[in-house]
Amino acid sequence: YDTVLALRDAGFSVGALCGYPREYAEGGKVPTKEDADGIYIHRLKYIQTGRTGFLGRIVNYFSFTFHVLLHLPEIGKYRAVVVYSNPPILPWIASWAKSLFGTKLVFVSYDLYPEVATVTNTLREGSVICRLMNHINKCVFRRADRVVALSSEQKNCILRTRNAVDELVTVIPNWYRDEGGLRDREENRFRELTAGRFVVSYFGNMGTMQDMDTILGAIRALREENCLLYTSDA
């Protein structure tokens, strides 16, 4: 959302093609189309099942991607499309807009597929879905005008495992704002909690692909210390 607002403030006409919310909607029914803060939003209704199981996620992925495919001409009306790596088949559709309409393609890599699925033993290497993902990677990275990686480590992995050009891959950390300097300590809402303490913060995902053993080890080693605060949105 910050990216969308920044593009709008820079003078671009911005639209968002996204899924219709199932559990995050507040206040009841959400319109399928609306103009919010100068941004045209088109929400697509699709089959949404439970997200906890593998089969449910696959149904959600394919259903949403299919409905985006039906709106491919809408994507083609824009000069550029910014597409994220999740669901993993979605960038393939965006790459077709590049081929059919000449729409510039910006691919934002949150996750690397099929590696995420194979490392977590969700999929077997060489399976039909893995081969499909590898084909999608070839199409997307061949057609992308720009690729955004979340870290230098991810960029190095992309350059090592994908047919990507170094100059086209840019590192933009997530949830980062260049506000030009440090904030005033008096404006820190946690100033009383952190006063006189050395604070180490971890702001990141806590999932199957993260090294949680280090964090859990610190919790166990320092469990008697009254100096730890863990907050999360489980």
Residue ranges and their predicted role:
Residues 89-92, 96-101, 127-147:
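Membrane-proximal helix-turn-helix segments that form the acceptor-binding/catalytic region
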Residues 189-210, 216-219:
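Conserved donor-binding/catalytic core segment of Leloir-type glycosyltransferases
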Residues 29-33, 177, 181-195, 199:
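A short helix/loop element that forms part of the nucleotide-sugar donor recognition site in Leloir-type
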Residues 61-67, 73, 78-116:
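An aromatic- and histidine-rich active-site surface loop
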Residues 1-37, 219-222:
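N-terminal subdomain of nucleotide-sugar transferases
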Residues 153, 175:
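Carbohydrate-associated surface elements
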Residues 46-56, 101-135, 184:
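Acceptor-binding helix/loop patch of EC 2.4 sugar-transfer enzymes
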